[in-house]
Swiss-Prot record:
GO terms for molecular function: carbon-oxygen lyase activity, acting on phosphates; magnesium ion binding; terpene synthase activity. The lineage of its organism: Eukaryota, Viridiplantae, Streptophyta, Embryophyta, Tracheophyta. Mg(2+) 2 binds at D307, D311. This is Valerianol synthase TPS1E. Disulfide bonds: none annotated. InterPro entries: Isoprenoid_synthase_dom_sf, Terpene_cyclase-like_1_C, Terpene_cyclase_plant_C1, Terpene_synth_N, Terpene_synth_N_sf, Terpene_synthase-like, Terpene_synthase_metal-bd, Terpenoid_cyclase/PrenylTrfase. Mg(2+) 3 binds at D452, S456, E460. Mg(2+) 1 binds at D307, D311. A motif (DDXXD motif) lies at residues 326-330. The keyword Magnesium applies. It comes from Camellia hiemalis.
């Protein structure tokens, strides 16, 4: 990842040639520097939300509703983004529904696929056999399916919960995409349904940013003739109130970052405070996790600048000094560093000290050590890539991935994310679980690493960069770039299968923790879907504005 010294130095004081990336600047100026929370509006939203929550809670636990109606209610609550208010009630209902589920011949494709998706999302391993009745004697999908747009859409979304060995869901995925794409814009779909289909094809429910997908669904649900006005009202109020909270938090983070003034000392680095907070909000959006969002954002910002230092500025000799300093984690190590690295190193130590003090007040600072160790590990792996780049070495794909699963930040992000959760959820055992290199964390890291390798490949190679996974695979297997991309995306899909399998019961740790790893995987899908949206933030600018600035009209 490092820039190397190119050419001979004229003398010992000459500045080495550096492969500067010339990253796009921050988009935001002082846009998020100030924000005053409207307390009156906040209280107004909050008072009505509490009333509506009790009404909806009564709906969830009320008896007499058919299973299909109950599963649909749970689906609507989740897609509207308000299910986090009713987690206990929903889990109790799903446990009963799964225990009593029968493959009723009266259930249509929409209902079966909905059951499958909801059960799988909550860890219940429903068999793919429930879809057998939608295949003919030759094993082909029945022709009547093509006319059931809602059923096809429901099945399409369900296929994203597949695990390894479920060939039927692979076939169903390809089939539903082909059918839905052929219907978009045609005479058989209303404009509203066509809009839903187009959005689903662009972004699935399971891999989407939860809060953004909730906002999209609210706009669709509002046009649904069968909508429940109580649910719709609660969803709008909840989104807008939580948006106010997030906007206030973002203002605090943005000001903190400006006051830290690190970018002025390392101007080669990406200035991405807003984007890092956006990322953290995907990991956990719920109001009680405000400390976690701040902690994760700060650590991500430091890692981002560290990444750019190894990737686009530091010489190999400078980077070795920095790696050693991080391993020591002691202020005295600063004396050995170049001036620009001193600023970064000082910020690293100070921010972790600040985070540790804040978490100690709540009795949950025991995770900080694990985060520091993960940071040290990443820096060691950055140095390995720096050496590869200096030597012009193209590693085997296996050797590359062994190192890349560290630089993908899966362990660091997961550890830092857990630090922001309640002590009774993120226990010492949870942090020890991360040390076992669990399949889910590795899969999450692989998704982020491989999709980034594909999306940023051309730009990175143009300026000079260590061989990526794409390059390593091409060389080792003697294939074209396009062929290698196909293979890497197969690996990404298998990583998603592993994540889906890891959330099936019985799980290694609490689902409240696993959902955070899933969310960290989701943000990779959103940010790197078509291009590197972190390096080029204009790609996700509309998402940021939608999430933090634009309220839903009441």
């Amino acid at each position: 990842m490092a820039s190397s010294q190119v050419g001979d130095m004229v003398n010992g004081n000459a500045e080495p040639t550096r492969h500067l990336a010339k990253f796009p600047p921050s988009l935001w100026g002082d846009r998020f520097t100030s924000f005053t929370l409207d307390k009156q509006l906040w209280d107004k939203y909050g008072n009505e939300i509490e009333v509506l929550k009790e009404q909806v809670r009564s709906m969830v636990v009320a008896g007499g509703r058919k299973a299909a109606e109950q599963i649909n209610l749970i689906n609507v609550l989740e897609r509207l983004g308000v299910s986090y208010h009713f987690e206990k009630e929903i889990e109790e209902q799903l446990e009963q529904l799964f225990a009593k589920f029968e493959d009723n011949e009266d259930y249509d494709l929409f209902t079966i696929a909905l059951h499958f998706r909801i059960f799988r999302q909550h860890g219940y391993k429903m068999s793919c056999d429930v879809f057998n009745k939608f295949r003919d004697s030759n094993g082909e999908f029945k022709e009547t399916m093509s006319n059931d747009v809602q059923g096809m859409l429901s099945l399409y979304e369900a296929t994203y919960l597949k695990i390894r060995g479920e060939g039927f869901l692979d076939e169903a995925h390809a089939f539903t995409i082909a059918q839905l794409e052929s219907l978009v814009g045609g005479p058989h779909l209303s404009s509203d349904l066509s809009e839903q289909v187009m959005h689903a094809l662009k972004q699935s429910i399971h891999r989407g940013f939860p809060r953004l997908e909730a906002k999209h669904f609210i706009s669709f649900y509002e046009k649904d003739a069968s909508r429940n006005e109580t649910l719709l009202r609660l969803a709008k109020l909840d989104f807008n109130q939580l948006q106010l909270s997030h906007r206030e938090e973002l203002c605090h983070i943005f000001r903190w970052w400006k006051e830290l003034d690190l970018i002025s000392k390392v101007p080669y680095a990406r200035d991405r405070a807003v984007e890092c907070f956006f990322w953290s909000t995907c990991a956990y959006y719920e109001p009680q996790h405000f400390v976690g969002r701040a902690v994760l954002t700060k650590i991500m910002l430091l890692l981002s600048v560290t990444d750019d230092t190894y990737d686009a500025y530091g010489t190999y000799d400078e980077l070795k000094l920095y790696t050693n300093a991080v391993q020591r984690w002691d202020v005295s190590a600063m004396d050995e560093l170049p001036d620009y690295m001193k600023a970064l190193y000082r910020a690293l130590l100070n921010v972790y000290d600040e985070v540790e003090r804040d978490l100690a007040k709540q009795g949950r600072d025991y995770g900080v050590h694990h985060s520091k160790e993960a940071f040290k590990e990443i820096v060691r792996s950055y140095e390995i890539e720096a050496e590869w780049f200096k030597e012009g070495y193209v590693a085997s794909f296996e050797a590359y991935m062994k190192n890349a699963l560290v630089t993908s930040t899966g362990r660091l992000h997961t550890t830092s994310c857990f630090m922001g959760l309640e002590a009774d959820v993120a226990t010492t055992e949870a942090f020890e679980w991360i040390l076992t290199k669990p399949k889910m964390v590795a899969a999450s890291g692989a998704i982020g690493r491989l999709v980034d390798d594909v999306m940023s490949h051309d730009e990175e190679q143009e300026r000079g960069h260590v061989a990526t996974g794409l390059d390593c695979y091409m060389k080792q297997h003697g294939v074209s770039k396009q062929e290698a991309i196909v293979e890497l995306y197969k690996m990404i899909e298998n990583a998603w299968r592993d994540i889906n399998e890891e959330i099936l019961k019985p799980t290694a740790i609490s689902m409240k923790l696993l959902i955070r790893v899933l969310n960290l995987s989701r943000i990779s899908d959103v940010v790197y879907k078509y291009v590197d949206g972190y390096t080029h933030p204009e790609i996700i600018k509309d998402h940021v504005i939608s999430l933090f600035e634009d309220p839903i009209p009441m």
